[in-house]
Regions:
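Protein-protein interaction and targeting regions used for scaffolding, dimerization, and localization
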Residues: 1-66
Length: 66
């Protein structure tokens, strides 16, 4: 289970790093105002989360890990 959890966290951070739709600035093109703090497991800033896309990322990652 620990490996699946780690894989899901990594997948979400990759989504952020690729500037995809699941995690994006709440206003305009403010990517520079959002910070990924991997060591803490946080993405910090004024963001807009697409929960459906995040769930898809997690489910897809779990399916790959099983």
């Amino acid at each position: 289970m620990k490996n699946i959890r780690k894989a899901c966290v990594e997948a979400i951070f990759r989504e952020f790093e690729n500037e995809c739709d699941a995690i994006r600035p709440a206003a305009g093109d403010g990517w520079d105002e959002i910070e990924a703090r991997r060591s803490l497991g946080h993405i910090v800033g004024c963001i807009d989360l697409d929960v459906t896309d995040l769930v898809d990322i997690v489910v897809d990652t779990i399916n790959k890990e099983l």
